[in-house]
Amino acid sequence: MDAMGERKEHRQGSAAALSGRRLADVIKLVPSFFGFAFVRAWDDLAFSRFAALFPDTPWLGQDIVSLGMLPVFLLVVLAARRLAPLYRRPALVIGAPLMMVAAVVFYELSLGLPDGAQAALVLAALLAGAGAALSILQWAELQSCLNSLQIVLYVSGSFFLGSLLGWMALDAGPERMAVIMLLLPVLSLFCLKAAFAKIAQADLPKSDWGAVRFPWKLVIVLGVYEFAMGVTQGGTSFGADAPVLGVLVASAVLFCLAFFFSHRFDFTRIYRTPFVLMVCGLLAAVLSFSASNAVANMLVSTGYALMFLLLTMLLCDISHRYGVSAALLCSIEELVMFSGVGGHLAVQPAVQAAVPPLQDGVVVSISLTVLVVVASMVLLSEREYSRWGASFFGVGSRDPEGDAQAAFVRRCEELAGQHRLSPREKEVFQLIAEGKSPSEIEGELYIASGTLKSHTRRIYQKFNVHSRGELIALLQEKEG
């Protein structure tokens, strides 16, 4: 066998070994997959049930559920330093599934209460929103304990499985639907407990943190996508399955890229180079008013789902690297969903009558296109996501260790930029600087031993050092 054939066989063997390692790692944290998937499925089913109460304006039922989420997200944003981490507070851990179960009970009771049905339904919707919001934030804390590639795998995999389970259960009869919705929160709670039990102590969410930059501009772009989604949902031709299919497509693509191609594909480029998101946004805004409603709705839903998934993964990664509360970061992200409520209202007859230009589909389409273009240009103007937004998380008490960790990460990024390291080399460099062993680095980045040696050799060459000790000494010298 010639040298080229040997290298090819080695690459194939390495890829197979890495896929096996990923599969074993996924199986190790199975509760993370199923637990969050159960919450996503319950969330989709709850939105669907309340939307069905308003056949002419299904978005109204969804907005009432969203209204129940609002106080939870606001409270966490305003009092994160006192509340986080949420998973350590038994009242919140038990309260989330209890509210979800209570929402199902009140919904079922409303069917037999002709006099108080409306009040029971509103209470059920608000409880559903509050319970789901608390549960989502606790799962965000769990996902922030994982490394970057695991975050992509678990977030995308859970969204896919949850949307699939919810979609498959939509046709269940009333009795079966009630049983399913009563079981899902309980199962999710057990999975949450089991998942946190498997997390190493060093990786658990911190109770305090220092200052870190927040990607405000990405959140603004997500808000634009949400508004476009809301405008499309508010139309009479919007397909009920479009959001689910959009999530399935976006999450499946991200999962497959991470699972099968991460050893050859630089996955960090997906959220650092948002050109694809700009294209999705433009197509979503323009084609949502085309003659092909099915295609347009699918583009809108997929574009929004992709943006939401990528931002969720980025925020969990920021939380993992800097120690900032994932509940805080994801609460801010979730608050932008209320721009979708504005989109729903913008296309309603009463609003269109008050604002005549909104009656013209072409005007609305052009306006959305301009919004998406401007937002995408702002996003594309930033080269490093660590520079996005403004530093405001340091207000109030600060954890010296959190500040030290943030400073350490920034120092690594500065040195990596000065020596022109590739994205993968930056990851290897930071893990070496953290004192991780070669086997730990291989496991965290899912790379073969030969690949790690190759990256390490190039890093040494670019820094003009000859050993790990010299590299760490150089980092400490810069620190001093």
How would you name each of these model-derived features?
Residues 39-50, 71-72, 191, 195-197, ...:
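Linker/hinge segments immediately adjacent to helix-turn-helix/homeobox DNA-binding domains
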Residues 62-83, 253-257:
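Central cavity-lining transmembrane alpha-helices of secondary-active solute carriers
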